[in-house]
Amino acid sequence: MTPLCLNCSVLPGDLYPGGARNPMACNGSAARGHFDPEDLNLTDEALRLKYLGPQQTELFMPICATYLLIFVVGAVGNGLTCLVILRHKAMRTPTNYYLFSLAVSDLLVLLVGLPLELYEMWHNYPFLLGVGGCYFRTLLFEMVCLASVLNVTALSVERYVAVVHPLQARSMVTRAHVRRVLGAVWGLAMLCSLPNTSLHGIRQLHVPCRGPVPDSAVCMLVRPRALYNMVVQTTALLFFCLPMAIMSVLYLLIGLRLRRERLLLMQEAKGRGSAAARSRYTCRLQQHDRGRRQVTKMLFVLVVVFGICWAPFHADRVMWSVVSQWTDGLHLAFQHVHVISGIFFYLGSAANPVLYSLMSSRFRETFQEALCLGACCHRLRPRHSSHSLSRMTTGSTLCDVGSLGSWVHPLAGNDGPEAQQETDPS
């Protein structure tokens, strides 16, 4: 028996006896190919149970509790991310524009996709939203999947240009350029999600000489499965394996560049005259190096978490598309992969704000400010000017970024209208 693949937006076509009422005789060979003769005597409920399975997904309660926890953390975290970037001018950097776009994608998944999937797990059939709702559901999941990976890839390219090619970054890493890139990202994501969307539709169970079974409508694959297999495997290759390989190479090059620069700067510091001069120069270099290393480390961890969270999703879809003969062992393995892929799919949408809070002092500060409500909170928290958003501390009390802004943010203050922009979200 072929297992169901609900978060793949498909149901196996061989579970459905046909898309229209069979005009052949009730005991014809075509009818016997799909239904047992006993099916004519079964009630509608028994037919639905036989061919569609239980109406409520097994393990619904524990999965529901897990999803609700992810929903709360992700909705609050991504909402705060969007809020602080919109409210604080100092946070409207090219890098943070990508993070804003990623947060919007995650919010779409959590606020629209997750409740819809929870409802379907509670009530697997009938699908109540019609053909339009089926198209929307499939398009949403596919589009945010593609938009997320394109966002993270574009962000990695931006970080590579900023670190390895700083002169080109002055003209390329600007807010206007990022807005154009993000427009292209979402446009490409929607365009590339259309093939999978077009393969889906609404099907109902039909019994020969009896007609459609009430309340059996399901949003599922309605085109040849070979087309779906090709789309899924191509998507996994072009929108997961290839981007992960590109990002791995980019961050390797970034790491090598930062290491080489650090060694050169240390050698230059040793050539300074007095001990006091070497100390001051070393302090400035530490701040410059710390700022770039911190943001690069945060974005690298974001990419790693992204890969971990999305790998089960693609493994789930590819496994369903390549296996033609299902044994009990494969069926059991797929069920485990399917549950894990669903949890990690939504966990990936909730993890990013947690990473920002843990690894970025600037995001952590603005998150606390956004959550701090009331006069009492204002009295308790230290006063921060907008300039404090670009301050970082090190082990030395002699180092203060306030006087070294051009070192920590070499792209700031040189681009006319972009004079206030910074490339680091930390």
UniProtKB/Swiss-Prot annotation:
Assigned GO CC terms: cilium; membrane; plasma membrane
Membrane side Extracellular: residue ranges: 1-65, 119-138, 203-235, 316-338
Keywords from the named record: Cell membrane, Disulfide bond, G-protein coupled receptor, Glycoprotein, Membrane, Receptor, Transducer, Transmembrane, Transmembrane helix
Annotated TM spans: 66-86, 98-118, 139-161, 182-202, 236-256, 295-315, 339-359
Compartment(s) where it occurs, according to its Swiss-Prot or TrEMBL record: Cell membrane
GO molecular function: G protein-coupled receptor activity; neuromedin U binding; neuromedin U receptor activity; neuropeptide receptor activity
Cytoplasmic side: 87-97, 162-181, 257-294, 360-426
Bilayer topology term: Multi-pass membrane protein
One Pfam match: 7tm_1
CDD domains: 7tmA_NMU-R1 (cd15358)
Classification via SMART domains: 7TM_GPCR_Srsx (SM01381)
UniProt record, GO biological process: calcium-mediated signaling; chloride transport; G protein-coupled receptor signaling pathway; neuropeptide signaling pathway; phospholipase C-activating G protein-coupled receptor signaling pathway; positive regulation of calcium-mediated signaling; smooth muscle contraction
Tissue: Expressed in greatest abundance in peripheral organs, particularly in elements of the gastrointestinal and urogenital systems with highest levels in testes. In central nervous system structures express levels are much lower than those seen in peripheral organs. Within the CNS, has been detected in highest abundance in the cerebellum, dorsal root ganglia, hippocampus, and spinal cord.
InterPro entries, per the entry: GPCR_Rhodpsn, GPCR_Rhodpsn_7TM, NeuromedU_rcpt, NeuromedU_rcpt_1
Disulfide bonds: C134-C219
Glycosylation sites: N7, N27, N41
Chain's role: Receptor for the neuromedin-U and neuromedin-S neuropeptides.
Similarity section: Belongs to the G-protein coupled receptor 1 family.
Name this protein carries in UniProt: Neuromedin-U receptor 1
Source organism of the structure: Homo sapiens (Human)
